[in-house]
Amino acid sequence: MKQYIEIIDVVARQILDSRCFPTVEVEVYLEDGTVGRAAVPSGASTGIYEAVELRDGDKDKYLGKGVEKAVANVNDTIAEEIIGLNVLDQAYIDKTLIELDGTNNKGKLGANAILGVSLAVAQAAANYLGMPLYQYIGGVNAKVLPVPMMNIINGGSHADNSVDIQEFMIMPVGFDCFERAVRACAEVYHALKKTLNSKGYSTGVGDEGGFAPNLKSNAEAIEVILEAIEKAGYEPGKEFFIAIDAASSEYYKDGKYVLEHEGKTLTAAEMVDFFEDWVNKYPIISIEDGMAEEDWEGWKLMTERLGKKVQLVGDDLFVTNTERLKTGIEKGIANSILIKLNQIGTLTETLNAIEMANRAGYTAVVSHRSGETEDTTIADLVVAVNAGQIKTGAPARSERVAKYNQLIRINEELGEVAEYRGRNAFFNLSK
């Protein structure tokens, strides 16, 4: 097998994501006929420091959300630069893409154009070598199946209801294998549907497959989930814990946190009190974006108060960016980073962020976006880096289920080598 295999063509197209908006799909062709394909996701609640997702802005097409400019950038500018390069040199190709763009936020070519190429290159290389993507990226030590962080009640910008908090999730930490954990999550999901029906609530779903009922309060979301866990025959606080994504940048206004549906306007300290009260009352193991992306002082306070007993995940805070993560580590802020490929724009930069987090004792949670496709790259990525946690929606809607099904296949392929760490995935929390 050759150690230098040339890229001979790169083709991008506009396809649809799960929210019926266009996104970029890229195919990379190699000299021996091998092809790699990848599709790029898109977020609903986006951090202001994320790499730029290039949209056309033509209101006559797809409400201005078209990606024909990004597609043209791949088919013309990027293709010209990377045709002839060695597909097996991912780091060099990603460096070439970054330099070709020349901006610090990928605003010229678009992170959606660059990421599509970066991921398609990796897939083409794995296909050429005849190995699974997780093994190509992670090598022989890639063997940890993740604890799912399943979003089963949607609120905030992921739903049209009376809940301020964006996501309420279940984490099956009390099981000894991935497949058993997924089964338990599916059973809780069905139990939750019955529970909501019995209370007269809607069981329509949000962007990520979770239910979006018009609950009376944010706390009621947790309470109906705990009821569903018990109805499914499991024990909250033992087999299942709760994770929330507060997405608090969405309701941070003029230095205050405005919980519209609660009728409350809170200071940073009061917001920390709010979460601390929940942590003391409910089996919560993870809080994502509990403070706004600009509220470093609030984050510091929250970390001091809750950082030993709860995973505090920075999403909008860190945006998968090593510079922002480095600042957070130096200031002792948060203890975990959410990893979203399209926030930074290349596979290499994503791997660098995960490595930096691990060195600092932070956990890394590999994540989907609300606008997804059938692409399963993140399922392979989470195993490749042994991250131990994945956030990819409810066990419903095929663009979410595709990731879980890929993980089931990987689990089967790894066989006895596969590890499922459960509660031990939270290695930096006190037991």
UniProtKB/Swiss-Prot annotation:
One of its GO terms (biological process) is glycolytic process. It is found in: Cytoplasm; Secreted; Cell surface. PROSITE patterns: ENOLASE (PS00164). Binds a second Mg(2+) ion via substrate during catalysis. Its main location: cytoplasm. Keywords: Cytoplasm, Glycolysis, Lyase, Magnesium, Metal-binding, Secreted. Pfam families: Enolase_C, Enolase_N. Its cofactor is Mg(2+). It is an enzyme of class 4 (lyase). (2R)-2-phosphoglycerate binds at residues 166, 340, 369-370, 391. Its EC number is 4.2.1.11. Pathway: Carbohydrate degradation; glycolysis; pyruvate from D-glyceraldehyde 3-phosphate: step 4/5. It catalyses: (2R)-2-phosphoglycerate = phosphoenolpyruvate + H2O. One of its GO terms (cellular component) is cell surface. Mg(2+) binds at residues 245, 288, 315. One of its GO terms (molecular function) is magnesium ion binding. The active site is at 208 (proton donor), 340 (proton acceptor). Belongs to the enolase family. Catalyzes the reversible conversion of 2-phosphoglycerate (2-PG) into phosphoenolpyruvate (PEP). It is essential for the degradation of carbohydrates via glycolysis. This is Enolase. It comes from Clostridium perfringens (strain 13 / Type A). The gene is eno.
